[in-house]
């Protein structure tokens, strides 16, 4: 609350973690995705910057893709666990998967960027996909709860046309794919991991595509 302005938007205090995870915070526009996140010229304090934004839409009522939602969600988790996201994920996920500590961009306050900037090899992307394909189990150890895997892959919003690979639906930080039961993690410029539970399959690709996503499809 030390980052709140003196007269915050009434909807701001209604935002919950679940709203941030499914891109329904209510900010109604993409934030911390362009110049406002550019090193040296962007917002010097992401939390303070976001707390000052208007929230014209009721949280949870409408989808609007924005890196700011993921960034704020990561900050919320950090407060809950008392650790930076990099440390927490390394302990709970990356180390058990023998992934090491990934290169990850940080914001001006030193927080790992919850909205992107994590550099992984294709093999590491496949490992994370395999973890979710196995309902959170890795070599007999339950790394992530089955309930959470089910929750993140359940659509919170669905879109038309349903045949469009990029606009089928959205769960918790995962896009819903058109194949039955499938969902995927998308990274910038065509870094994609798709989990297809009914096929027992994970597909990961890395691609330097910057605009024509039909080529990625």
Locate the predicted segments by residue.
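Short, gly/Ser/Thr-rich active-site loops of penicillin-recognizing serine hydrolases
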Residues: 213-217
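A short acidic/small-residue loop/turn micro-motif
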Residues: 209-211
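Structural recognition of the beta-strand scaffold that forms the well-ordered cores
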Residues: 16-22, 64, 101-104, 119, ...
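Active-site-proximal binding-pocket segments
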Residues: 95-152
